[in-house]
């Protein structure tokens, strides 16, 4: 699921951390990767890729990782990408936070 925000008042790093996300890594594509556990185990978890341009516009890609990679050396995993259920609720919470950040 893709979310776009014009001229964010705060950085994606700060906003997502306030929402309980942990920074995971920088990607080769120049994105920041964040994860947020749904329960006590490593999976399932929300996974967000974030990129901000020079004008402050933010592009997020959100999905739900159901489990880790099923074989060594692979990044492929089972995930949900559609706009429904728990993923839609998380997207709405992210939209609310990006539109009205607590500075």
Language model features with spans:
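Ser/Thr-rich, low-complexity intrinsically disordered terminal regions
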Residues: 10-47, 54
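C-terminal basic regulatory modules in eukaryotic proteins
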Residues: 49-103
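A structural detector for beta-sheet-dominated domains
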Residues: 4-6, 37, 63
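Terminal, regulation- and interaction-focused segments at domain boundaries
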Residues: 1-18, 99-103
């Amino acid at each position: 699921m893709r979310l776009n925000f014009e001229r964010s008042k705060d950085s994606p790093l700060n906003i997502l951390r306030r929402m309980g996300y942990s920074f995971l890594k920088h990607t080769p594509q120049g994105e920041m990767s964040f994860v947020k556990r749904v329960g006590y185990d490593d999976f399932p978890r929300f996974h967000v890729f974030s990129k901000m341009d020079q004008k402050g516009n933010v592009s997020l890609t959100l999905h739900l990782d159901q489990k880790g990679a099923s074989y060594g050396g692979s990044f492929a995993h089972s995930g949900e990408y559609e706009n429904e259920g728990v993923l839609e609720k998380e997207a709405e919470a992210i939209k609310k936070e990006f539109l009205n950040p607590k500075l």
